[in-house]
């Protein structure tokens, strides 16, 4: 529910009418401290039909309670509900069979960060793997010699994160 994310969408608030209950579990507004008037009105309208709302951060709960007449619960990030053995089972066997750096960015527009990762990789003599192909093609960070891992999804993300020598986010 972070209004500053590139893929922010009304669809995340289930705006269609229907008879099903609308419940959020551990939504995140990110580090948003202030919501402009237009977004505030939209969020207020979209949350009106929710039966229950929970978020991950106290700040998000405070923000949403000010916009709505709802009691907003703060709940644990769902990634923290699994044990190490659960995560190991999910991630599976190593997908890249050599040492590497995993760099995850939601957009790759940060030239300074890209350059930092590139220099670090050169120092360590390691290849840098990235995912998030839609952003890759928009920002074209090939000049930094990053390798786009062609598969994607939660399991790929977790696997690349788990087995990397170094991770940059």
Indicate residue ranges for each PLM-predicted region:
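Aromatic- and Gly/Pro-rich donor/ligand-binding loops
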Residues: 1-45, 114
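Acidic, amphipathic alpha-helical patches
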Residues: 43, 117, 157
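Short, well-ordered alpha-helix to beta-strand connector turns
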Residues: 19-20, 50, 144-145, 163-164
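Short, acidic/turn-prone active-site loops that include or flank metal/cofactor-
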Residues: 76-82, 133, 151-156
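Catalytic donor nucleotide-activated moiety binding site of glycosyltransferases and closely related
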Residues: 24-31, 63-64, 105, 112-153
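A donor-sugar binding/catalytic signature common to diverse glycosyltransferases
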Residues: 158-169
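A nucleotide-sugar donor-handling region in carbohydrate enzymes
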Residues: 26-107
């Amino acid at each position: 529910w972070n209004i500053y994310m590139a893929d922010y969408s009304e669809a995340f608030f289930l705006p269609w009418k229907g008879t099903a209950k609308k419940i959020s579990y551990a939504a995140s507004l990110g580090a948003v401290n202030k919501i402009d008037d237009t977004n505030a009105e939209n969020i207020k309208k979209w949350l009106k039909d929710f039966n229950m709302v929970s978020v991950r951060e106290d700040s998000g709960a405070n923000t949403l309670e000010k916009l709505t007449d709802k009691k907003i619960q703060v709940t644990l990030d769902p990634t923290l509900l699994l044990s190490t053995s659960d995560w190991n089972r999910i991630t599976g066997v190593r997908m890249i069979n050599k040492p590497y750096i995993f760099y995850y960015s939601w957009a790759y527009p940060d030239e300074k960060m890209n350059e930092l990762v590139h220099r670090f990789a050169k120092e360590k003599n390691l290849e840098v793997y990235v995912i998030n192909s839609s952003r890759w093609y928009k920002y074209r960070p090939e000049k930094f010699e990053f390798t786009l891992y062609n598969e994607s999804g939660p399991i790929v993300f977790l696997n690349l994160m788990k087995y990397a020598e170094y991770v940059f986010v």
